[in-house]
Amino acid sequence: MSDPGLDAGFRLLYEVKFEQAREAFAQWQRERPAEPLGPALEAASDLFEEFYRKGVLTSEFFLDDNRLLGGIKDKPDAELERQFASAVQRTQKLARARMATQPKDPDALFALTLIAGMQADDFFLIQRRQLDSMHSLRETDRDARILLGVAPDTDDAYLALGVANYIIGCLPAYKRAVLWVGGVHGDKMLGMQQVSRAAASENARYLRPFARLMLALAALREKNPDLARLQLQELATEFPENPLFAKELAKVTPVITGVSSHDAP
């Protein structure tokens, strides 16, 4: 069932109105102080803003192996990192308190899956702490699998699994071999399938637009501009106030039509 408060917060998030999105999620949390999802979504606002500022969610970043697999060169935003870490800690505290009496509570598991996936992304792409990222990826995989066993229609969980599988699958073979020894596996094609499921499913209640963007960027890496353009068209139409979606759509249009989007009738 849709939650109007959360829907409004996500709308603001995908319109890159980060401060307003944070406040919407914080207000939702104030009305439900025991819910771990509230601070998890505040953390999502912080990380999404950092990604947006650093250009992580662009084709230039995603198509550059040195950047995608090596992380950003600039220093992280100290305030956003502080807010993100605080929201992560609050989420974990509330989720563990819930699971002390309800070990397989789907809401707590969903919050933990989101947090672990976001921590993995933050460690890998922003802080360039790959070993810590691998630890978070293992947590993501564990929590997501438990969650899907309890609530199999929680298709938002496939985004975290898919992004992890895809990025690890893009690593050189020698790095993947080290991760296999550490219990972290990666599979590009499986990752694409998992992200595709989140991008297409009505049951991906909150992260479907983000999954569409990730699918578009992965599709460009896999030389499938038609799939990328389809996702970006839908995003640009649904969120006209987000300049990122329109810019990425303009970049991929000449790849397909052979003409600049500015010259198109």
Give the predicted meaning of each segment.
Residues 40-41:
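N-terminal maturation segment of proteins
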Residues 210, 217-265:
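A cross-kingdom marker for long, charged
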